[in-house]
Amino acid sequence: MEKLLKILIIDDEEPILSNLCSFLNYKNFDVTSASDGLEGLKLFEKDPKGFDLIITDIVMPKLSGMSLISIIKKKSPNTPIIAITGWGEYPEALALESQADKVFSKPFELSELDKTINELISSKKQKVQD
């Protein structure tokens, strides 16, 4: 049996967090969630290589998504990160600034998120093999 890929989702908006968790569980991912940046960082630090991908909101209490991404990328540069934001008119610029691999502006289509997750995980596997 193939190992389930592990995804950490961090968002302070409970309906979004719940919907993302439900969707990704349905897609057979092993999902861990946090409701703020600090909680997400603690979960990441327990096992820095334990997550195949991280999805985080940008604007959150206790620790912003931008700060969280910076910390994670220093400790685990090959872990793909998707940032989600309600503020993003220019998601490409935000991706560069935040070091996220991809940025989605809310609202977004779950099918697009699913496609991006699969692309980023495939790319990560390819880098590991090279």
Regions found by a protein language model. Give the residues of each.
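C-terminal output helix
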Residues: 108-119, 125
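Two-component/phosphorelay signaling modules centered on CheY-like receiver
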Residues: 14-32
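Alpha4 helix (beta4-alpha4-beta5 surface) of REC/receiver domains from two-component response regulators
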Residues: 67, 87-104, 111, 115
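Receiver (REC) domain active-site loop signature in two-component systems and cognate sites
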Residues: 60
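Acidic catalytic/metal-coordinating carboxylates
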Residues: 35-39, 64-67
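Short amphipathic alpha-helix used as the core "switch/output" element in two-component signaling
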Residues: 42, 66-78
